[in-house]
Amino acid sequence: MNGLAFLLVLLQPASVSCPIERSVYQLSSDPAFTAGFAPQDPHLAFYSDLAVWLRTPRRTYWFSLESPSGQGGTYLVPSVDPRAAAAVDDAPRDADEGQEAPLRIAFDVFGADLGPWPAPPRRGDPAPAFLFARDLGPALWYDWVRLAAGDRSAAQEVMPVGTFRPMACDTGAG
């Protein structure tokens, strides 16, 4: 098989068809890393009614989606599990919290034609064919506490660069 044909085979998205909030993605360069979308209270995140989760060998990270002015692309911003967010009270934050600029990680979403999505994904959208966030790996290595929304029990991890491709449709049973 020549190089171009091999590349085209690699770029073919898996044929998993399900709603965006049930699509499960696997990192092409390390199957131990999976990702997906979950419904989020739209009052907590202006740009999308979906949160993004990343499951690593050690923990699950949660992100809100952000798109500054609609012109700067889509970014992942560390957040908390939207299912637990309702249980979080309005207690004051630690004094040192909020002094650093929020961590924002460029997040690219592609269709099967490799065309980029013009806006952050939302409920009702078809499941993307590819997800890519180049700076997630470096954030897991250099900035893991901020990536875990301030959770100091988080630990440094190594994640290679790669695209996330659909692998399954979550049945919601687990």
Task: List the model feature ranges, each with a label.
Residues 26-28, 36-38, 53-57, 66, ...:
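A structural detector for beta-sheet-dominated domains
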Residues 44-93, 173:
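Central antiparallel beta-sheet cores of small beta-barrel/beta-sandwich binding domains
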Residues 22-49:
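Short, solvent-exposed loop/hinge segments that bridge or flank secondary-structure elements
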Residues 73-137:
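Surface-exposed, polar helix/loop patches in the mature regions of secreted/periplasmic/lumenal proteins
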Residues 12-24:
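N-terminal helix-cap/turn-to-beta initiation motif at the start of protein domains
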Residues 112-174:
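Glycine-rich, aromatic-bearing surface loops/beta-hairpins
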Residues 2-12:
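Sec-dependent N-terminal signal peptides
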Residues 34-38, 60-69, 143-145:
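Short amphipathic beta-strand/extended segments with alternating polar/hydrophobic composition
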